[in-house]
Swiss-Prot record:
Its EC number is 1.2.3.1, 1.17.3.-. It comes from Macaca fascicularis (Crab-eating macaque). Residues 240-425 form the FAD-binding PCMH-type domain. NCBIfam families: mam_aldehyde_ox. The gene is AOX2. This is Aldehyde oxidase 2. [2Fe-2S] cluster 1 binds at residues 47, 52, 55, 78. Coiled coil: none annotated. Its cofactor is [2Fe-2S] cluster; FAD; Mo-molybdopterin. [2Fe-2S] cluster 2 binds at residues 118, 121, 153, 155. One of its GO terms (molecular function) is molybdopterin cofactor binding. Its main location: cytoplasm.
Length: 1349
């Protein structure tokens, strides 16, 4: 029990209101307190590690020294210890503004700029932007990018979020589109010559002139009581007691030092950014925590003639400002070290983490990937230590970094400050890092390098090099540096230095983190970059000083002009761009919203935090919490499950096992709860039910499961093929005579394509609330799902009760992407068993780690192809064999295989084709539906064939694509009629709008002039088939009520996932009923109002549900027609009142029977898809051949939307899916251990695209509309189609790499691997450095990770 009576009182403010609390848990976070205690649910839980920004809030504190409010700073509430907030003012999204009172300009602009989709990340985005504006009312674009760098969004693609933020920036109030001097919003209205006839084409998605202005004087003031507290600080020690942990916050440095003597093992907690995640993931436990937050001496900054001393308590963000200020004050020669540190600080984590983490904590933690320690180590920084016995200094050197006792802190000592000396003339300091992506990512390798040359010469007087990421801690290459003293700074020295470094900084083949050869290459690549930087600086100095240079070229200090670009880092910029769509007919009534860029129905609620998600539902009386216990073995027999220790814990109510299931335990081979055997790490075995979520999770660790390992254990596709381990029969399509065609071609190529898996990373993890009713075994289930009917059916069979006793409710879903089609039924059923057994409501909310471990994702793919073609590039025969890694159960793997094969031809008409596909059964968690449903993987194989043919023929890939594309009306491989006219239009429009051919020449010119940087450009066509391959999956229903006041309630079978389906349904109802959208409301999706629904998936949600809503509205309007004709001058309200009096039903069910679709796999013939979406994308990139990094320069997308229901929403879907696809092909990499354990289980390890990954110029055009009678108002579903267009970035990178390999006479490699990570790009750009690294025999060590595709 907590000792509340002994605890001091915690005093802080939230949204201007005072909070006084004695009963606080020192292990608790601000996020938990806000959500559970204060019911402020706008702050979201998404990752629990500070890596996504969904829980961002603003904290403000007063500085008694400067007598000013310290900069307001954004923090991630999931890491912020609640006890650390004494004397602070917290502002949450609810405190910024509300739709009930007044919207803040930030909230208004992000909503009206269409910067929200699912809305789960939006409160965090708002708070990051709001905090920025509190500090800088007119920020720079660089500050905006920096502020949002720690916030992730999986839906929007970031462009509209940044656009909303840019409206506050001081550079300009418009984008001044790329050198034209004109705002992109003005194109459609003011430049008809560029965009067509007047009123035909538009680019204005929102009315910026209607935004309310920002008035900084109207913000919430800092609480006067906190001012008084800060000016007369509490000097006594504050103590807060919890059940397991005591938090002690001393008021003076003397008290802190005395406490350190008393509790020498107690860690100091400042930002909790290192300790917090470690306590969670590594199960670290500390009974006493010391907080130095109130010790002002630890935040002092001292400027001296020889350097800068920064208090250990200063945050990394404060350190950033301090360094920037010092750089501005001192001559350049003295600030080399400060510049190097500042460079790393800008990319270190996100803004929130930099605001929380302290300099001292960063240094003392000695993380192997520390970005600052390598630079501090080489710059001769010293650590000022203090204890009750006195002070002393120790060098921050290799001995300290290695943790040697003789060079470390004593248990009773603390770090007071860090002294960083000035650099001097002829001294050069640089920092380098390479991570999976540019921002908010831990580095694979980083380095600090410093050289002091003998004045007036290029002779090395002192040299220091340190690396991070290549060992358990930062490694100093002291021995190598000593051997290079006295050497000239030239090529001979460089060769010797590389040899020495590779020998000293050695990585074993089994090194943690893997990527061993890549890391070895970076060790010498970074050195080469440093070598070039110093040479370039010497070139400047030689004008002032006589530098001794030898006559031999090997002794001459020069930098080739071709090498200069290697010295430039890729800039971080806010994307510019134009979004083009067809305007509505000028004769369309203003009240008719169809075709207009209407704001998302819930956008304002997203921005204010008032949108309710599943876990935002208030606590239900007698509610219990559930946590899952999963398998730690990949394939094993369960010998025993001992739950006794878990049940002994306080607040634990029960443990649910398979024996408690009254009905069916899932399907054969796919159990809800494991029985007798487990077939993957992460399989659910049982579940703990407890009074608190914390105790439920702790109890899972007490359950002891005994296993007996079984054979075989299969993880990879190749192993599955070897063991003939498949989930379903082969799917095959064939046309023409493939073997005969191969005999007649000029050339053939065979190749392999490996496509990695992908995590859905929906921002809202899987969650469900099951509430049992008091009679008839009824249940109310609130669940985050794309398919509530499936949840309903699964719970029914699990509990053995009729479906009609179960009602599933879906208000909104925080992202789905296919991951919430089948999986939520599992969690709903397990929670329902717990609810029935205990008689209590059950809430189950998955942690991000468990969600990623359990739920699976996109299927990894291994493809083999053989392609036959003529010398001019005409493909005559193509044979592709694809295998996908389905995991341990069938799930949707058979359907994914079918869709993959059906869509494999993409945009190409090849007369002789053979496509085969198999789904492999492995001992990994089952993979499932994911946006695109096999097409993004399969089409990459097809496009790889195209690029291989182009390389062999010596022709540009776009020429091969054009030559083999569908040209006239024809039939697909499955004999469905197909007219390629719109496909060709998209291709030609993309070529034209992207200025492809002229830019191709510019790319080639750039590549001639640059050796270490290369550009690439690619254009990709797309034919995407929409829908399910079965008629029954296209049906939909709707229920529309008109109430006597004239208001309308619409319910339908679609689920709001962020794709705007509710908004579009209101647009449909508004048009059909001829009333304003404001008169119509959608509350939720419920199986009680619209039964037997189909999953909201396959891009047809708005299509089919729109037709059902249309049908219902037309029925109602037909009933009203006699009244309207009789009283044409009447109002809507008059007509409804009259209808009621005449006993006319004001409720109607609408129904759409669905599109006809079928596929006969025996005959290879079908009409499986109702229609196609066509598109094309052109992307240009620049790669760094020395590090593998890349920058997206420009992307142009042309998409066939036919007649868009809502251009703003549709463009948002295209941009979001494109960026998600880009992530699949570039940065998103799942890593598994040789034991089948998923390493990538948080945003720390798994990198989805961030703000800085958006192309610098990002243009999207909806092709001018055409008519199709098949769909609602001739619209098309665009939810998935943009996904594959992200491959244009992949092929642009491949184009740049191919240029490198041709230039260096390296043979073509027809094995394609996705994603194109920095590791793969760097190693493909083979050079002198990749050749010099040692390589290990794979038979001699156990790798850290294994490839599963």
């Amino acid at each position: 029990m907590r000792c509340a009576s002994r605890s001091d009182e915690l005093v802080f403010f939230v949204n201007g209101r005072k909070v006084m609390e004695r009963n606080v848990d020192p292990e608790g976070t601000l996020l938990t307190f806000l959500r559970k205690n204060l019911r402020l649910t706008g702050t979201k839980y998404a990752c629990g590690r500070g890596g996504c920004g969904a829980c961002t809030v603003m904290v403000s504190k007063h500085d008694p020294v400067s007598r000013k409010i310290q900069r307001h700073f954004s923090v991630t509430a999931c890491l912020m210890p609640i006890c650390s907030l004494y004397g602070a003012a917290v502002t949450t999204v609810e405190g910024v503004g509300s739709i009930k009172t007044r919207l803040h300009p930030v909230q208004e602009r992000i909503a009206k700029s269409h910067g929200t989709q699912c809305g789960f990340c939006t409160p965090g985005m708002v708070m990051s932007m709001y905090t920025l504006l509190r500090n800088h009312p007119q920020p720079s674009e660089e500050q905006l990018t920096e502020a949002l760098g720690g916030n992730l969004c999986r839906c929007t693609g970031y462009r509209p979020i940044l656009e909303s933020g840019r409206t506050f920036c001081m550079e300009s109030n418009s984008c001044q589109q790329k050198g034209t001097g004109k705002c992109c919003l003005d194109w459609g209205e003011n430049d008809s010559s560029r965009l067509g006839k007047k009123n035909e084409i538009c680019t204005k998605l929102f009315a910026k002139e209607e935004f309310q202005s920002l008035d900084p004087t109207q913000e919430l003031i800092f609480p006067p009581e906190l001012l008084r507290m800060a000016e007369n600080p509490e000097k006594r020690t504050l103590t807060f007691y919890g059940e397991r942990v005591t938090w002690i916050s001393p008021g003076t440095l003397k008290d802190l030092l005395e406490l350190k003597v008393k509790h020498p093992e107690a860690p100091l907690v400042v930002g909790n950014t290192s300790l917090g995640p470690a306590m969670k993931s590594q199960r670290q436990f500390h009974p006493v925590l010391l907080s130095p937050a109130r010790i002002s001496e630890l935040s002092m900054v001292t400027k001296t003639s020889d350097g800068l001393t920064i208090g250990a308590g200063c945050s990394l963000a404060q350190t950033q400002d301090i360094l920037a200020e010092r750089i501005a004050e001192l001559p350049e020669e003295k600030t080399q070290t400060y510049r190097a540190l500042l460079k790393h600080l800008r990319s270190l984590a996100g803004q929130q983490i930099r605001n929380m983490a302290s300099l001292g904590g960063h240094v003392i933690s000695r993380h192997c990937c520390s970005d600052l320690n390598p630079v501090l180590a080489v710059s001769n920084a010293t650590l000022n230590l203090i204890s009750a016995e006195g002070t002393r200094q120790i060098p921050l050197n290799e001995h300290f970094l290695a943790g040697l006792a003789s060079a470390d802190l004593k248990p009773e000592e603390i770090l007071e400050s860090v002294h960083i000396p000035h650099s001097q003339k002829w001294e050069f300091v640089s920092a380098f890092r390479q991570a999976q992506c540019q921002q908010n990512a831990l580095p694979h390798v980083n380095a600090g390098m410093r050289v002091l040359l003998k004045e007036g010469t290029d002779s090395i007087e002192d040299l220091s090099i340190a690396y991070g990421g290549v060992g358990a801690a930062t490694i100093s290459a002291h021995r190598s540096c000593q051997q290079l003293l006295g050497r000239r700074w030239n090529e001979l020295m460089l060769d010797e230095a590389c040899r020495l470094l590779l020998d000293e900084v050695s990585l074993p083949g089994s090194a943690p983190g893997g990527r061993v050869e890549f890391k070895r290459t970076l060790v010498v690549s970074f050195l080469f970059k440093f070598y070039l930087e110093v040479l370039q600086e010497l070139k400047k100095l030689v004008k002032l000083f006589s530098v001794a240079v030898g006559a031999d070229s090997r002794h001459r200090s020069e930098v080739s002009d071709q090498f200069l670009s290697a010295l430039e880092d890729f800039p971080v910029t806010i994307p510019q761009g134009v979004q083009t769509y067809q305007n509505v007919d000028p004769h369309q009534p203003l009240q008719d919203p169809v075709g207009r860029p209407i704001m998302h129905l819930s956008a304002l609620k997203h921005a204010t935090g008032e949108a309710m998600f599943c876990d935002d539902i208030p606590v239900v009386d007698k509610e219990l919490f559930m946590a899952l216990v999963t398998s730690s073995r990949a394939h094993a027999k369960i010998i025993s499950i001992d739950v006794s220790k878990a049940l002994e814990l306080p607040e634990v109510v029960d443990v649910i096992t398979a024996e408690d299931i009254p009905g069916t335990n899932g399907a054969e081979g796919d159990k809800l709860l494991a029985v007798e055997e487990v077939t993957c790490v992460g399989q659910i075995i049982c579940a703990v039910v407890a009074e608190t979520d914390v105790q439920a999770k702790r109890a899972t660790e007490k359950i002891e499961i005994t296993y007996e390992d079984l054979e075989p254990v299969i993880f990879t596709i190749k192993d599955a093929i070897k063991h003939n381990s498949f989930l379903c029969p082969e799917k095959k399509l064939e046309q023409g005579n493939v073997e005969e065609a191969f005999e007649k071609v000029d050339q053939t190529i065979e190749g392999e394509v490996h496509v990695g898996g992908q995590e859905h990373f929906y921002m809202e993890t899987q969650r469900v609330l099951v509430i049992p009713k008091t009679e008839d075994k009824e249940l109310d289930i609130y669940v985050s799902t794309q398919d509530p009917a499936h949840v309903q059916k699964t719970v029914s069979s699990t509990l053995n009760i009729p479906i009609n006793r179960i009602t599933c409710h879906v208000k909104r879903v925080g992202g789905g992407f296919g991951g919430k089609v089948g999986k939520p039924a599992v969690f709903g059923a397990i929670a329902a068993v717990g609810a029935i057994k205990t008689g209590h409501p059950i809430r189950l909310v998955l942690d991000r780690e468990d969600d990623m471990l359990i739920t699976g994702g996109r299927h990894p793919l291994f493809g083999k192809y053989k392609v036959g073609f003529t010398n001019n590039g005409r493909i005559k025969a193509l044979d592709i064999e694809c295998y996908i890694n389905g995991g341990c159960t069938l799930d949707d793997s058979e359907l994914v295989t079918e869709f993959l094969i059906l869509k494999l031809e993409n945009a190409y008409k090849i007369r002789n084709l053979r496509f085969r596909g198999r789904a492999c059964m492995t001992n990994l968690p089952s993979n499932t539906a994911f946006r695109g449903f096999g097409f993004p993987q399969g089409a990459l194989v097809t496009e790889s064939c195209i690029t291989a043919v182009a390389a062999k023929c010596g022709l540009p890939p776009e020429k091969i694509r054009e030559k083999n594309m569908y040209k006239t009306v024809d039939k697909t491989i499955y004999k469905q009629a197909f007219n390629p006219e719109t496909l060709i239009r998209c291709w030609n429009e993309c070529l034209d709008k992207s200025s492809f051919h002229s830019r191709r020449m510019q790319v080639e010119e750039f590549n001639k002039k640059n050796y270490w940087k290369k550009k690439g450009i690619a254009i990709i066509p797309m034919k995407f088939s929409v829908g399910f391959a079965a008629t029954s999956y296209h049906q939909a229903a709707a229920l529309v009520h008109i109430y006597t006041d004239g208001s309308v309630l619409v319910t339908h079978g679609g689920n709001e996932l962020g794709q705007g389906i509710h908004t579009k349904m209101l647009q449909v109802a508004s048009r059909e009923l001829k009333i304003p959208m404001s008169c119509i409301h959608i509350s939720e999706t419920s199986t009680a109002t619209v039964p037997n629904t189909i999953a909201t998936a396959a891009s047809v949600g708005a299509d089919v549900n729109g037709r059902a809503v249309q049908n219902a509205c037309q029925i109602l309007l037909k009933r009203l027609e006699p009244i309207i004709k009789k009283h044409p001058e009447g109002t809507w309200e008059n007509w409804i009142e009259a209808a009621f009096e005449q006993r006319i039903s004001l409720s109607a069910t609408g129904y759409f029977r669905g599109y006809k679709a079928f596929m006969d796999w025996e005959k290879g013939v079908g009409d499986p898809f109702p229609y196609y979406v066509y598109g094309a994308a052109c992307s240009e990139v620049e790669i760094d051949c020395l590090t593998g990094a890349h920058k997206k320069i420009r992307t142009d997308i042309i998409m066939d939307a036919c007649c868009s229901l809502n251009p703003a929403i549709d463009i948002g879907q295209i941009e979001g899916s494109f960026i998600q696809g880009m992530g699949l092909y570039t940065t998103e990499e799942l890593k598994y251990s040789p034991e089948g354990i998923l390493y990538s289980r948080s945003p720390d390890e798994y990198k989805i695209p961030t703000i800085t990954d958006v192309p610098e110029e990002f243009n999207v055009s909806l092709l001018p509309s055409s008519q199709t009678p098949l769909t609602i108002y001739s619209s098309k579903g665009l939810g998935e189609s943009g996904m594959f267009l992200g491959s244009s970035v992949f092929f642009a990178i491949a184009d740049a790499v191919a240029t490198v390999r041709r230039e260096r006479d390296i043979a073509e490699d027809f094995m394609v691997q996705s994603p194109a990570t920095p590791e793969r790009v760097r190693m493909a750009c083979a050079d002198r450095f990749t050749k010099m690294i040692p390589r290990d025999d794979p038979e001699t060590f156990k790798p850290w990770s294994i490839p599963i595709a």
